[in-house]
């Protein structure tokens, strides 16, 4: 799966599953501050990532991820 496909899937689940406004979804967007993703959303993200990408997110690995670009980097490192 290439980077573009990962970004499209992430964008899709942020809009469809978490109901985040499309205008808040851009590479430098901060997950908590700009997209208002809270701890309950992170629980949903664990399930969604498993569904879309086939692996389980680990909380300790997510701790250093602040932006959407970093999140996509993390997913890319796991699926490729």
Question: PLM features: residue spans?
Answer:
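Phosphopantetheine-dependent thiolation modules in NRPS/PKS and related acyl-activating systems
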Residues: 2-37, 41, 45-46, 51-80
């Amino acid at each position: 799966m290439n980077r573009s496909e990962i970004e499209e899937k992430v964008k899709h689940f942020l809009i469809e599953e978490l109901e985040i406004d499309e205008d808040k979804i851009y590479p430098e967007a901060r997950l908590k501050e700009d997209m208002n993703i809270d701890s309950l959303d992170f629980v949903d993200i664990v399930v969604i990532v498993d569904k879309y990408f086939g692996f389980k997110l680990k909380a300790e690995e997510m701790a250093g991820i602040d932006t959407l670009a970093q999140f996509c980097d993390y997913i890319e490192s796991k699926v490729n």
